[in-house]
Swiss-Prot record:
GO CC term (a single one): nucleus
GO molecular function, one term: protein homodimerization activity
Keywords: Acetylation, Cytoplasm, Glycosidase, Hydrolase, Nucleotide metabolism, Nucleus, Phosphoprotein
Subcellular location per the Swiss-Prot or TrEMBL entry: Cytoplasm; Nucleus
Species this protein is from: Homo sapiens (Human)
Protein's UniProt name: 5-hydroxymethyl-dUMP N-hydrolase
pH dependence text: Optimum pH is 6-7 at 37 degrees Celsius.
Subunit comment: Monomer and homodimer.
Keyword Phosphoprotein: yes
Family: Belongs to the 2'-deoxynucleoside 5'-phosphate N-hydrolase 1 family.
Regulation: Inhibited by AMP and GMP.
């Protein structure tokens, strides 16, 4: 079965809208699609806070084999890195293990991006120490959650520190 061309991944790499934060969502594709409907909910909520550059991750048409692109895997890699560089915030659902998501997170750290990782402990899985151990409580955060509270958690994260705004310093002289 061939992989499908997915809506949301266009020829143009410029996806952001002027004046709106660019958000990069990471979720498992080739690592497993069990959480796809949850990804739809996350992407839908993220749209309230900015332009989701990678909304195709939640597409029903996208199966575990991924997608077809004219340039193959290399084009997908280059395009996703371009979007990652454009992003103001990276949000990753990390419950379903995925080499690709781990790679994206490593690159996001190297690009000094704000990162929020969401993990569901009730899944029975254990989150990699390389993800949980990277959390610094500021630029890189890992939040454990239950599926029913994902929208409220995203609201809390983005309303507390909206993208594009400088966080207030605890020291008023700085």
């Amino acid at each position: 079965m061939a992989a499908a061309m997915v809506p949301g991944r266009s020829e143009s790499w410029e996806r952001g809208e002027p004046g709106r934060p660019a958000l990069y969502f990471c979720g498992s594709i080739r690592g497993g699609r069990e959480d796809r409907t949850l990804y739809e909910r996350i992407v839908s909520r993220l749209r309230r806070f900015g332009t989701v550059l990678t909304e195709h991750v939640a597409a029903a048409e996208l199966g575990a084999r991924g997608e077809e692109a004219a340039g193959g895997d290399r084009l997908i890699h280059e395009q996703d890195l371009e979007w990652l560089q454009q992003a103001d915030v990276v949000v990753a659902e990390v419950t379903q293990p995925s080499l690709g998501v781990g790679y994206e997170l490593g690159r996001a750290v190297a690009f000094n991006k704000r990162i929020l990782c969401l993990f569901r402990p009730q899944s029975g899985r254990v989150l990699s120490a390389m993800i949980r151990g990277a959390a610094d409580g500021s630029r890189f955060q890992v939040w454990d959650y239950e599926e029913g509270e994902v929208e409220a958690l995203l609201d809390r994260y983005f309303e507390a520190d909206p993208p594009g705004q400088v966080a207030a310093s605890p020291d008023p002289t700085t």
